[in-house]
């Protein structure tokens, strides 16, 4: 998802003077945190994918 679509004003935000309007800054921060987490997972997978996968697989394949 692009930053433009995350921070685009919603319907009814024509004049920008609505005191209850949400700016989308928190949404961008959440998206950035998710991107950082995915980058960390990618780096772990690149270095040791087998151990990463085994940590999620229980005995018996469950």
From Swiss-Prot:
Gene Ontology MF: a single term: proteasome binding
Cited Pfam families: Pup
Tagged with keyword S-adenosyl-L-methionine: no
Pathway where this protein functions: Protein degradation; proteasomal Pup-dependent pathway
Cross-link (Isoglutamyl lysine isopeptide (Gln-Lys) (interchain with K-? in acceptor proteins)): 62
Disulfide-bonded cysteines: none
KW Ribosomal protein (keyword) present: no
Alphabetical UniProt keywords: Isopeptide bond, Ubl conjugation pathway
PTM notes: Is modified by deamidation of its C-terminal glutamine to glutamate by the deamidase Dop, a prerequisite to the subsequent pupylation process.
ARC ATPase binding, as annotated region: 21-56
Residues bearing PTM Deamidated glutamine: 62
GO terms under biological process: modification-dependent protein catabolic process; proteasomal protein catabolic process; protein pupylation
Stretches the record annotates as Disordered: 1-29
HAMAP family assigned to the protein according to its UniProt record, in alphabetical order: Pup
Domains as described in the record: The N-terminal unstructured half of Pup provides a signal required to initiate unfolding and degradation by the proteasome but is not needed for pupylation, while the C-terminal helical half of Pup interacts with ARC to target proteins to the proteasome.
NCBIfam families (UniProt xref): pupylate_cterm
Quaternary structure, from the entry: Strongly interacts with the proteasome-associated ATPase ARC through a hydrophobic interface; the interacting region of Pup lies in its C-terminal half. There is one Pup binding site per ARC hexamer ring.
Function: Protein modifier that is covalently attached to lysine residues of substrate proteins, thereby targeting them for proteasomal degradation. The tagging system is termed pupylation.
Family: Belongs to the prokaryotic ubiquitin-like protein family.
Name this protein carries in UniProt: Prokaryotic ubiquitin-like protein Pup
Encoding gene, per UniProt annotation: pup
